[in-house]
């Protein structure tokens, strides 16, 4: 038996302006080479653009987008007797949000456009409406999980 204590679970700190954990998750995922102030600039500009486009609270649009992209189920490769099967597994809320943030950023990087703030704002607005590349990725993941339901007993 281990003599070490259990590590306490760390919670993400909220960002300084909106005081929101989701914004901070986005900032930490968009961060490159330790330039956090640049990451904050990009996110805040994107939220400002969302405010101008939709005339709604940008945090509400962000929450809607992440809720729309968050997957309930995913597939995990599992090796059984020499062959690899895609086994569907349920995803917890934290992991689902992390996947949603990652998919939103990947989809916004793929978009054509001037700068990252513009592309991110467009992707977030589209995801909140129920369209866009990130939503397509979620639906694709759900389809794969549905197709491999026969292997659900291999969990």
From Swiss-Prot:
Q: Which cysteine residues pair off into disulfide bonds? A: none
An annotated GO cellular component of this protein is: small ribosomal subunit
The protein's location, in the record's own words, is:
Plastid
Q: Which purpose does this protein serve, as stated in its record?
A: One of the primary rRNA binding proteins, it binds directly to 16S rRNA where it nucleates assembly of the head domain of the 30S subunit.
Keywords tagged on the record: Plastid, Ribonucleoprotein, Ribosomal protein, RNA-binding, rRNA-binding
Lineage, highest ranks first = Eukaryota, Viridiplantae, Streptophyta, Embryophyta, Tracheophyta
Entries under HAMAP family matching the protein: Ribosomal_uS7_B
Q: Which GO terms describe its molecular function?
A: rRNA binding; structural constituent of ribosome
> Is the rRNA-binding keyword given for this protein?
yes
Assembly and oligomerization? Part of the 30S ribosomal subunit.
Read off the InterPro entries from this record. Ribosomal_uS7, Ribosomal_uS7_bac/org-type, Ribosomal_uS7_CS, Ribosomal_uS7_dom, Ribosomal_uS7_dom_sf
Q: Which family does it belong to?
A: Belongs to the universal ribosomal protein uS7 family.
Source organism per entry reads Epifagus virginiana
An example Gene Ontology biological process: translation
The name this protein carries in UniProt is Small ribosomal subunit protein uS7cz/uS7cy
Spell out the Pfam families in the cross-references.
Ribosomal_S7 (PF00177)
**Primary subcellular site in the record, as a coarse category:** plastid
